[in-house]
């Protein structure tokens, strides 16, 4: 069994509550990307609207740091698509439907990454 390092920016409850209390929520993910990200790393962002400021700022920070950015989003707002190197857009406009489209996509992405690095 092999593995790649990966960090979920929503998994650290202490960081999330502390940042929400002490820092503006628009910088919630950008601060973590700044702390963890290195040139050549990849940020996978998910936003059904494509206009969530906390996600957009994380992608902006990733790009400043020389990271790659892949986005899963809906098709209405171009902001997240424009900031990302690769944007996979659901044709749906209703958030639950967009999220349903994202499920198989990130499973396929995971498998492709595993195949690339380990097979």
Question: Where are the regions a protein language model picked out?
Answer:
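Glycine-rich phosphate-binding loops that contact phosphosugars or nucleotide phosphates
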Residues: 1-119
């Amino acid at each position: 069994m092999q593995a790649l390092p990966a960090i979920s920016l929503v998994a650290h409850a202490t960081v999330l509550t502390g940042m929400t209390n002490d820092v503006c929520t628009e910088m919630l993910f950008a601060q973590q990307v700044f702390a963890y990200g290195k040139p050549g790393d990849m940020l996978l962002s998910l936003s059904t609207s494509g206009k969530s400021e906390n996600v957009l700022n994380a992608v902006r920070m990733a790009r400043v740091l020389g990271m790659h950015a892949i986005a899963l989003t809906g098709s209405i707002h171009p902001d997240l698509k424009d900031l990302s190197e690769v944007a996979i857009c659901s044709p749906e406009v209703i958030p639950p439907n967009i999220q349903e489209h994202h499920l198989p996509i990130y499973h396929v992405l995971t498998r492709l990454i595993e195949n690339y690095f380990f097979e």
